[in-house]
């Protein structure tokens, strides 16, 4: 039985999606200020590992718990929605099926409380 990780193209696909997502974040007027001053190479590596893990790939995320990482950022629902929108769009451009994109976004949504630190 294949996993969501396999179905979306594994590590190379996740890395490409995250790279494209970061380009979108950098030009998004809502999101860019949140990431100002962030080490984006480190953030990229954490995000790739996090997504790989929640998509049933290798257990490689070794960062702090999400709620601790995002404490003090004052992330709100519009921030989450914008990132989810960009993530879904980047997955579609990468050729991930609508079904697998929805499954991936559902898994990210399941983490929303920790992501928004609420």
From Swiss-Prot:
Belongs to the truncated hemoglobin family. Group I subfamily. Binds 1 heme group per subunit. The keyword Methyltransferase does not apply. CDD domains: TrHb1_N. Its main location: membrane. Its cofactor is heme. It is a peripheral membrane protein. One of its GO terms (cellular component) is membrane. Monomer. Coiled coil: none annotated. This is Group 1 truncated hemoglobin GlbN. Keywords: Heme, Iron, Membrane, Metal-binding, Oxygen transport, Transport. The gene is glbN. GO terms for molecular function: heme binding; metal ion binding; oxygen binding; oxygen carrier activity. Heme binds at residue 70. InterPro entries: Globin-like_sf, Globin/Proto, Globin_bac-like_CS, Hemoglobin_trunc, Hemoglobin_trunc_I. It comes from the Bacteria. The keyword Lipid metabolism does not apply. It is found in: Membrane.
């Amino acid at each position: 039985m294949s996993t969501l990780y396999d179905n979306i193209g594994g590590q190379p696909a996740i890395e490409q999606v995250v790279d494209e997502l970061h380009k979108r974040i950098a030009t998004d007027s809502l999101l860019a200020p949140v990431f100002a001053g962030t080490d984006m190479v480190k953030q990229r590596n954490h995000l790739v590992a996090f997504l790989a893990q929640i998509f049933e790939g290798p257990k490689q995320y070794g960062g702090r718990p999400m709620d601790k990482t995002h404490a003090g950022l004052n992330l709100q629902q519009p921030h989450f929605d914008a990132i989810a929108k960009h993530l879904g769009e980047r997955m579609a451009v990468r050729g991930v099926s609508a079904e697998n994109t929805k499954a991936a976004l559902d898994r990210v949504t399941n983490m929303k409380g920790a992501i928004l630190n609420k």
